[in-house]
Curated annotation (Swiss-Prot):
It comes from Xanthobacter autotrophicus (strain ATCC BAA-1158 / Py2). Gene3D superfamilies: 1.10.287.310. One of its GO terms (molecular function) is structural constituent of ribosome. This is Large ribosomal subunit protein uL29. GO terms for cellular component: cytosolic large ribosomal subunit.
């Protein structure tokens, strides 16, 4: 998920998406522990998406200006 897509979401949608990603991260952690995880890159992707969502939530809460990527 790109940062501009995350910024377009409402605060409620951000919270829902964060909850969904945390559940998926939890399931992937168990798959890794039991040796059933096939796509190991997905855990890194989810971790970064969670960080993006948390960053956007903080920006919206504090009213920080949005900077576009160069």
């Amino acid at each position: 998920m790109k940062a501009e897509d995350v910024r377009a979401l409402s605060p409620d949608q951000l919270a829902d998406e964060l909850l969904k990603l945390k559940k998926e991260q939890f399931n992937l952690r168990f798959q890794k522990a039991t040796g059933q995880l096939e796509n190991t890159a997905r855990s890194k992707q989810i971790r970064r998406d969670i960080a993006r969502i948390k960053t956007v939530q903080t920006d919206k809460r504090t009213g920080a200006p949005v900077q576009k990527a160069k």
